A protein has these predicted regions:
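Short, extreme N-terminal segment that most often corresponds to the first beta-strand
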Residues: 1-25, 192
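Short amphipathic alpha-helical segments and their helix-coil junctions
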Residues: 27-54
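Residue-level detector of well-ordered alpha-helical segments, enriched
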Residues: 33, 57-64
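Short acidic DE-rich linear segments
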Residues: 176, 187-193
Length: 193
């Protein structure tokens, strides 16, 4: 298992995520959709079918997808060197409420060390000091930042919907949920300002 940093994309399994996306997703999807990518990773058995399936690979993949999403949000591009320059073809990156919720739940389960059938959370165990049991502070901070940003994305999305749609539809929870669903169907990125 090779790793050269604290990020999920800085290990061999993260490169596997990038290779799958490069070969099977990006060529046909200039606008990347986080929900579609999650489904592709489930099909490729890089993510579990549900949260009860706990594995190092699944956890690393969830973190890698969150890292990719925020790399796009921060830079407006995905910066990976491939001869074909396939990543330059990406023009957008969308995320539905469900996709954000999926990653938030997966990463929160990691933080809370929800155990696998062997009683551990392998990805956390790998970052623990054998003597003290302390989780590597830099890795834990990175995980917490991803969780905080996913949570903020969900909140910003809800605020956008309430701000721009609340007056038109009366602001009831059912109406706002309908608007959220319709916004997800548009496949457009929701501005956060």
């Amino acid at each position: 298992m090779g790793a050269w940093g604290i990020k999920a994309l800085e290990r061999d399994e993260g490169l596997d995520v990038l290779d799958i996306l490069k070969n099977e997703y990006v060529p046909e999807h200039p606008v990347m959709d986080l929900g579609e990518m999650i489904e592709l990773m489930k099909e490729e058995v890089m993510l579990g079918a549900d949260f009860s399936q706990i594995d190092f690979l699944f956890d690393n993949t969830a973190m890698a997808l969150a890292e990719l999403y925020f790399q796009w949000k921060d830079n407006g591009k995905l910066d990976y060197d491939y001869e074909e320059a396939i990543w330059d073809k990406v023009t957008g990156f969308t995320a539905s409420k469900e996709a954000l919720a999926f990653l938030l739940r997966q990463l929160t389960d990691i933080k809370n060390e929800v155990p696998d059938e062997d009683g551990i959370r392998e990805i956390v165990d790998l970052w623990k000091n054998e003597d003290s049991g302390e989780i590597a502070p830099a890795w834990l901070e990175h995980l917490n930042q991803l969780i905080d940003r996913l949570d903020s994305e969900q909140e910003a999305r809800q605020m956008y919907i309430k701000k721009y749609w609340g007056n038109f539809i009366g602001g009831s929870d059912d109406s706002l949920n309908l608007v959220a669903f319709l916004e997800d169907q548009k496949q457009e990125e929701i501005p956060l300002s």
